[in-house]
Amino acid sequence: MSIYQSIQDFISLALQNGTIEPLDELYHRNQLLHFLGLNDWAEVDKEVHETNSLILMDQLLAIANENNVIAKGQDEFYEAALMNFMTPRPSKINHDFWEKYQASPDDATQYFYELAQQVNQVKTRDIARNIAFSHLTKYGKLEITINLSKPEKDPKAIAAAKLVKASSYPACQLCLENEGFYGLGNKPARSNHRIIQVSINGEDWGFQYSPYAYFNEHSILLNAKHQPMEINKRAFDNLLGFLDKFPNYMIGSNADLPIVGGSILTHDHYQAGRHDFPMAKAELRETIELAHFPEVSCGIVNWPMSVLRLASENQVELSKAADDFLKKWQVYSDESLQIKAKSTDGTPHHTITPIARIRDGKYELDLVLRDNNTNEKYPDGIFHPHPALHHIKKENIGLIEVMGLAILPARLGTELLEVEKYLLNQDNQMDEIHKAWAEQLKNEEHFTRETVHATVQGAVGEVFEEVLKDAGVFKDTQEGHEGFRKFIDFVNQ
């Protein structure tokens, strides 16, 4: 296929998805020719030959590289800017989204998600590189992902980033100002990035899809204002308010304290999507009667972390009950279990990771109790993955991990292969951090070429289960169960 046919097909897709009108075609072609370093044209077939936008993207990037248009280390930015030629303006996308929303929220999100994939805002090919498997436990089937989707920056890109003058615009990666931002240095390319403007409880928010999605239709609801994360009644109201608009999705929030929170605490945001997480599938271990909220059902979830599940048809009462749990947890201590609400200087240590969904016609809130205390033995966190597990997971246990989906570092993609070689007594370059774990595995089982891969994956799953247990404040033991009931009694006073 000629380069001009590739360009024409690219333009035809832009016509089809509403980026341009027929009267814009010549203008769009000439802008694209200049962008690719071309100044000529040959008439081609108007019938589309290639309908895959990512294949066309590759073909046009190859043309640009041949013409030396892309500066060293600028591939990421140029690629996003190229796909911007195929991405409708924000006003067009918002208009079409809310028009489709009149038919159903499902129609609207399906339109936006499919478009985000077509224009490479959601990087489907990178996401497909992730290694994913599951591990069965007494709590249900945990999901494990080794995150290979985010490409490592090459040395040229790193060198180029150092030369870029520092900028405070946009203030962070979640600000609305990222929409259409070309990018520079360590600020990601967002030329083809689009955001849906949405009102939740009278406040302005943006709804977007995550470029490197961790689960199906992984999306982010971000505050129009750059302000810190905070878990409070307003947060519960926002989660439930989002469900009123998008009942087809679940939504949750990272905790708002270091160690137990996510990687971005400086910008108020929540994460949503269409995925039935392992924790959502978990049954109740026991039911609880709430003395002050008779319209709200409650129970303790059979889960390695400490989770309360509240449900009600009455959204107002449900939010009040969740807020009551939060306020009581923020002042509750049980030093026999190393649970301490505040330091002597008043520093708070207790918060909640909340998750909301609609199930069987009721609003449902899962409240995961979090404690970010540290001590001499566990300087990274008492209720954080303990050192023996750091060879697999040492990062914060955020919202997604809490719900039973492990996001493990890319290094494990190669490191675990070396562990497998070690277990088979083959020449290997196994990292020393895995030595004790691998020795333990070797002593427990005989490995063959046919069994080693699945067995190592199972062992990784066992580590993730232990990670979640470490993060649980009331352990799944008799002592932990009794401690949990004491807290419930405190709430019911």
UniProtKB/Swiss-Prot annotation:
Biochemical pathway: Carbohydrate metabolism; galactose metabolism
UniProt catalytic activity: alpha-D-galactose 1-phosphate + UDP-alpha-D-glucose = alpha-D-glucose 1-phosphate + UDP-alpha-D-galactose
InterPro entries (UniProt xref): GalP_uridyl_Trfase_II, GalP_uridyl_Trfase_II_CS, GalP_Utransf_C, GalP_Utransf_N
Compartments it resides in: Cytoplasm
The enzyme's E.C. designation: 2.7.7.12
Gene Ontology biological process terms in this record: galactose metabolic process
Pfam families referenced in this protein's UniProt entry, alphabetically: GalP_UDP_tr_C, GalP_UDP_transf
Keywords, sorted A to Z: Carbohydrate metabolism, Cytoplasm, Galactose metabolism, Nucleotidyltransferase, Transferase
Gene Ontology MF terms: UDP-glucose:hexose-1-phosphate uridylyltransferase activity
GO CC list: cytoplasm
Family the entry assigns: Belongs to the galactose-1-phosphate uridylyltransferase type 2 family.
The protein's name: Galactose-1-phosphate uridylyltransferase
Protein encoded by which gene: galT
